A protein has these predicted regions:
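Conserved G/P- and acidic residue-centered "switch" motifs that form tight phosphate/ATP-binding loops
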Residues: 8, 12, 109, 167
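N-terminal helical cap/lid subdomain that shapes the substrate entry/recognition surface
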Residues: 2-92, 96-101
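Short, flexible loop segments at the rims of nucleotide/cofactor-binding pockets, characterized by
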Residues: 81-86, 110, 179-180
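Asp-based, Mg2+/Mn2+-dependent phosphohydrolase catalytic module
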Residues: 1-3, 96-99, 103, 112-217
Length: 217
């Protein structure tokens, strides 16, 4: 039986896809470069900015360049997000209901701690989470399971008793490698893509997601 719920942030709690695309586009314009892939934004979904920058440009960069470009992208993203912060439909109600029922709740995200705290506070959700694990807390990004294993450890719940909501393919893979259930959220990928990555099912939003029904595989 599932005992705890772990949420990715971007595309699961915050409907942030448009803001991320705008931030990457603005960064590329600033540095005068074209993306190295016909669908560049798909390369970045679920990855820390430091990992996404070399993929987006498809060339070798110094560690200093990567850090500077990643920091600038994060700043641009926060600016765009603050100007139009939107939560995924139904997720606020669902999170509050989990808190009311005292179901352990965590965030496991590739975003920085600074971004997470500012965005979740702006969305009115920060206080409803027992544990928050960000890119600042781990050595390896998704699809490595570290972020989700750390979330489970801090919740003091066995990984196999955790349910993860994820919108990215690498995030679903990370959850499954951690031994957790995974439900996809189709804000960035199709249901078929998420299920093929390892999700047991997928939802468009949280309007029809209820506890304890979702706790049962």
């Amino acid at each position: 039986m599932t005992e705890a719920v772990v949420f990715d942030m971007d595309g699961v709690l915050i409907d942030s896809g448009a803001h991320h695309r705008a931030a990457w586009h603005a960064l590329l314009e600033e540095i005068g470069e074209e993306p190295a892939h016909p669908e560049p934004w798909r390369l970045t979904i679920g990855r820390p900015s430091e990992e996404a920058v070399p993929l987006l440009l498809n060339r070798r960069l110094s560690d200093y360049e990567v850090r500077q470009l990643a920091r600038r992208k994060r700043d641009l993203y926060v600016d765009f997000a603050r100007a139009g912060l939107v939560t995924v439909p139904g997720v606020s109600r669902f999170v509050v209901d989990l808190a009311r029922r005292r179901v352990p709740r965590a965030v496991g995200t590739s975003a920085s701690g600074y971004d997470v705290h500012h965005l979740l506070a702006g969305a009115g959700l920060l206080r409803y989470f027992d544990v928050i694990v960000t890119a600042d807390d781990v050595t390896y990004g998704k699809p490595d399971p570290e972020v989700y294993l750390l979330a489970a450890a801090r919740l003091r719940v066995a990984p196999e008793r955790c349910l993860v909501f994820e919108d990215s393919l690498v995030g679903v893979q990370a959850a499954r490698r951690a031994g957790m259930r995974a439900v996809g959220v189709t804000t960035a990928h199709t249901e078929d893509e998420l299920v093929n990555a390892g999700a047991e099912s997928a939802v468009a939003d949280f309007e029809q997601v209820e506890w304890p029904a979702i706790a049962r595989p």
